[in-house]
Amino acid sequence: MTNAIWNRLGPAAGLLFLPVLMAGLLIHRYPDVRPTDAHLANWLANVNATTFRFGVYVEALGVLLVIPFAAWLFGRVRQGAKDSSTPATAMLIATATWVALTLPINESWAGLVDQARSGLDIRVAQTIVSINQASYGMTGIVLGVILLSAGVAIVRGGAISRWAGWAAVIIGLFAMVSGPLGTDATPLSLLAYVWIFAVGGYYTFRPGMRRDLEASSSRASIGGGLPATR
């Protein structure tokens, strides 16, 4: 019973991860990447602190959803034909690290919004924005480690389609170099999130079919082992 619940909860968390994350982002929004002084000053003057904090809260919920997904994936990939516990463990550690590094970034944004209401020097504001955006860029390295480790575990063990594993390896490597390449500020930075969404969605809506196949296989094995009677 516990495994059945977990096998639905984990993938569902992966499926909801991206939509909840994007919902929070659309609620609070950020200024442009590397904004001009005029743009940043205008954004700070018009942003609603209450709405911003609510959006940050929703986005934080989205970030946390990756934990049950990773925990489920950890158990799933270890069921493969070959031992993949080492990359699976690396994925789990990297996930916890990514969450720990990502959550404080939005709190820094919230602090900036709060202080701007009392007046804030634009150079100080730009410094905080630069730190926040650079910090987000560096989380791409950790996110890349998550996918790279997951991909290696999948390809090695074969518990999940190896196509998903190779896709994770490629996207993971790309995410690790996205900061230096400057692609962390483009839609390409969402590829890792899309992979989590796709895997979560597939295993959310396909478990019933998988159980039917397993049950059919078991019945065939039992039937084949019964002696013929007259």
Where are these regions (language model features)?
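Hydrophobic, aromatic-enriched alpha-helical segments typical of multi-pass transmembrane helices
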Residues: 1-230
